[in-house]
Regions:
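AMP-binding/adenylate-forming catalytic core of the ANL superfamily
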Residues: 6, 57-59, 64-65, 79, ...
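Gly/Ser/Thr-rich phosphate-binding loop
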Residues: 1-23, 36, 45-46
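Short beta-strand-to-turn element immediately C-terminal to the catalytic PLP-Schiff-base lysine
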Residues: 14-18, 40-41, 58, 155
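Beta-strand->loop->alpha-helix junctions that form or flank phosphate-binding loops
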Residues: 2-9, 28-31, 139-142, 190
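Active-site and channel-lining beta-strand-loop segments
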Residues: 36-43, 193-200
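Conserved ATP/PPi-binding loop(s) of AMP-dependent carboxylate-activating enzymes
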Residues: 30-34, 45-78, 118
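Acidic/polar alpha-helix N-cap and adjacent early helical turns
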Residues: 210-216
Length: 216
């Protein structure tokens, strides 16, 4: 089994030979031959080895631009100090010591709280460890104090014997925050019947942000 990671616009492809690297199934593989993939921070500088950053890529088959959309094209491009052109993917990732790329989150979903990057996927993974949680999505909402603060929308498990063991929102909040770093702690938890999703199953986090009233 061979898995490919890339964009329709080009900008670099990663390949994972799953049968050859069973210990790397959590990654999207390594850059294909002739493809250059790098990670950059919010300022556009390349990140240090082992650090997370936005995935940008260069490949022989990159698009020249979006048709009649020069501004959108410029927003999608990144150039290294030597003038080499890359395409921004919008994904946040990290390379391991062997050069395998792990995707962490989407850049648009990154929460910047008190000047620190908070990755929703990290918080979601913790909440999914709770036996009463069936599904979860974490979003950043405006905060006068922190700029943004994380809020979790949680779908509780249903079924025989589940109703009596369902946690209250305050109980679940305390449980989660005791397992998170101080800078990651959730502001609140909202229970929801189901997460809004697109036709292809992606969680519509914009709708969740719109549902929540900004905290102080």
């Amino acid at each position: 089994l061979i898995e490919f990671y890339g964009m329709t616009e080009g900008g670099g492809t990663c390949i994972l030979e799953a049968h050859a690297h069973p210990d790397k199934l959590h990654t999207v593989g390594r850059p294909a031959e002739g493809h250059d993939i790098r990670l950059i921070d919010e300022s556009g500088a390349e990140v240090a080895a082992g650090a997370a950053g936005e995935v940008v890529g260069h490949s022989p088959g990159m698009m020249t631009g979006y048709h009649n959309q020069p501004e959108k094209t410029r927003e999608t491009e990144w150039f290294d100090p030597g003038g080499k052109r890359f395409i921004r993917t919008g994904d946040i990732g990290r390379f391991d010591a062997q050069g395998f790329l792990t995707l962490i989150d989407r850049r648009k979903d990154l929460i910047i709280s008190g000047g620190f990057n908070v990755y929703p996927s990290d918080l979601e993974a913790v909440l999914l460890e709770h036996p009463g949680v069936a599904d979860v999505a974490v979003v950043g909402v405006p905060s006068k104090r922190w700029g943004e603060t994380p809020v979790a929308f949680v779908v509780l498990r249903a079924g025989p014997g589940q109703r009596d063991s369902r946690p209250a929102s305050g109980e679940l909040l305390g449980w989660a925050n005791s397992r998170l770093a101080k800078l990651q702690r959730l502001h609140s938890i909202e229970f929801i019947a189901e997460l809004p999703r697109s036709a292809i199953g992606k969680v519509l986090k914009r709708e969740l942000r719109q549902r929540f009233q900004a905290p102080p």
